[in-house]
Each structure stands twice: as structure tokens, then as C-alpha cells.
């Protein structure tokens, strides 16, 4: 499994609009094959919000299917990125599930070990 974390610093004047756009995006993400989990959260400050979009993907194929060829680039609905001061994306290999053991169970679409060359 692959964890993808989008973080954004959003000025207070744009925070409500940015968060509304991301909430609109959540149902689209949940329909995408291979998405296991998604959570949108924020930490509110006086002048800005720090926003995270935590995604868990079954495998690299599913992640690339959603994010496209350049997985370091955020995939946001039009207009969202312009509301933020900065947006970044990072990826992690989930360690709480042994992909080889899960694949051995015969579960369809069980995650395979991540090909580190693809990162």
C-alpha cells in the first residue's frame, strides 16, 4: 500500500473556498479504483490553515491511475491550487501490512511490493 499526503498552507481569506473544493473532490476520489482510504483535515491558525489530504492507495498502478505520470504533482480540482500559498505531495510505503503475506492469501488485487525505481 502507498500513502500519499498532500499538504497545503492556505491564507485565512481563501481557507473556506479551498476546503470546499477539496470536500467536493472527495467523492470523485472515493470512486477511483484502488483508493483504500482518504481523510481531509486542517489545523486552523489565526492567519492561515494548514490542510492535509491523507490518501491510502492499494498499489502503484492505482496511485498512478489517479495522479497521472508525475505523482509529485498535486491532483486538485481547477482553481484549488491557486488558493494556497504552497502545496506539496509526499509518498510513503505503508509498513503496517506485509504485501507479500497479503498477496499469498490469494486476495484479488492484493498489493505487491512497491517498485522503488518508480518513485
How would you name each of these model-derived features?
Residues 2-8, 39-70:
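Short, well-ordered beta-strand segments in beta-rich or mixed alpha/beta enzyme
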Residues 28-36, 56-93:
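An amphipathic, aromatic/His-enriched active-site/gating alpha helix that lines ligand/cofactor pockets
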Residues 21-24, 69:
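Residues within well-ordered alpha-helical secondary structure of globular protein domains
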Amino acid at each position: 500500500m502507498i500513502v500519499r499526503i498532500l499538504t497545503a498552507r492556505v491564507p485565512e481569506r481563501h481557507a473556506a473556498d479551498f476546503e470546499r473544493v477539496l470536500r467536493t473532490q472527495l467523492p470523485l476520489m472515493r470512486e477511483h479504483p484502488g483508493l483504500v482510504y482518504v481523510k481531509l483535515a486542517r489545523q486552523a491558525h489565526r492567519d492561515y490553515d494548514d490542510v492535509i489530504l491523507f490518501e491510502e492507495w492499494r498499489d502503484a498502478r492505482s496511485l498512478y491511475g489517479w495522479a497521472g505520470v508525475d505523482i509529485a504533482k498535486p491532483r486538485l480540482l481547477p482553481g484549488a491550487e491557486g488558493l494556497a500559498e504552497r502545496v506539496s505531495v509526499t509518498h510513503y510505503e505503508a509498513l503496517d501490512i506485509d504485501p507479500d503475506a497479503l498477496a499469498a492469501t490469494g486476495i484479488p488485487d492484493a498489493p505487491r511490493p512497491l517498485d522503488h525505481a518508480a518513485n
